């Protein structure tokens, strides 16, 4: 039974109402500093911890709760007579409920004007110590670190005569240990990111020790293959617009491959300003297009490779309306992603309950890092978020691209970034015409892209081509020109750039160098 609570919070969301409810249930309130003042100003009967321990706060508040009368009351096991006798001998009442959240260290170091001294002062000591004590003794003590749990605790207390059950206490304790681990991880990341100058402004993006924190969203039926187990975890600092923010409206449970492919589709479609559709198969775009609306964009994207689109993942950057839904519903699709679905569109898919509909709000946030596991280690890099500006483009051929060719080239370049290397993409009129992905030689990717267009009945005459990396020889260029391309965009940087440019002039096509490579593995 909860008779006495200690409350000390930095995030004061909902704390007055929670404390009032506790007081109404007859719980004695202990508190510190600003929290105690807030509760007292609200007319609640509260005892300052300094008055409770008989020892004043000291060292500018660094020492407030580090006292045997606090930790003894938290750590004592109620089932051990010797523990209870020790409390009685020293006049220490039990503390049955601890409500604590910590100094805002992460928010502090996120500020541009934060100094090392600011960061150090926002490293909480007493808070984590109390939290860990209470979480360790969770059989007897209820500990709350998240304001979202106030209502849960109150409801259980009201239903059980001020008692909280073991299952809830255990869940809350595990939440505490996760929270303090993340807190210490953030401190370690920060301190080990400082350079020799020990200045906040000169932090390295890659700390000497990297701590990552993720919460499990769900266990998955299996991994990439049925014999592999898997789970999906969400970054605690999920950026706006990221896949992990999805809301599933209908359909079967997402699989490992569904999630991986959905991320590829969503990241690609978000980059377009015009209404766009991206169709993904095995993490590669097999159709990308922009159009007047979602239905138009889908119709164009589907034309690229109808065979590969079967059972694919489809993403839109505009609402899916009834027209788009009816067009998509004619095909077998695993997952459909959009910022929103009209009521009429939802009705269309109501008859296809296996189709997974994911709603994700658009946003321009990105993960801080791109991560890849290797045997015994982790590769960490910044995101491939470089967008080439028009002023950075360099026409290196005698013939300049026309305005239409320039539009097609920029579209193709945007798509090529999301195709597995080696990547060759034919485009025209705001749609992909042929995609060659994941080949060990660039010339083979060029041939495959050409064959794909031919199989789909699409002409490549007058098309634009993007290559994610330079042409090492002229052979790849010769293939795309023979297929009908009249302009090419590529990074450049090959030892044989001069030969490739000369070949482009020989074919009387336009070529643009971006100076930026987009390998994707």
Curated annotation (Swiss-Prot):
Pathway: Purine metabolism; IMP biosynthesis via de novo pathway; 5-formamido-1-(5-phospho-D-ribosyl)imidazole-4-carboxamide from 5-amino-1-(5-phospho-D-ribosyl)imidazole-4-carboxamide (10-formyl THF route): step 1/1; Purine metabolism; IMP biosynthesis via de novo pathway; IMP from 5-formamido-1-(5-phospho-D-ribosyl)imidazole-4-carboxamide: step 1/1. Coiled coil: none annotated. It catalyses: (6R)-10-formyltetrahydrofolate + 5-amino-1-(5-phospho-beta-D-ribosyl)imidazole-4-carboxamide = 5-formamido-1-(5-phospho-D-ribosyl)imidazole-4-carboxamide + (6S)-5,6,7,8-tetrahydrofolate; IMP + H2O = 5-formamido-1-(5-phospho-D-ribosyl)imidazole-4-carboxamide. One of its GO terms (molecular function) is IMP cyclohydrolase activity. GO terms for biological process: 'de novo' IMP biosynthetic process. Residues 1-145 form the MGS-like domain. The IMP cyclohydrolase activity resides in the N-terminal region. This is Bifunctional purine biosynthesis protein PurH. It comes from Burkholderia lata (strain ATCC 17760 / DSM 23089 / LMG 22485 / NCIMB 9086 / R18194 / 383). The gene is purH.
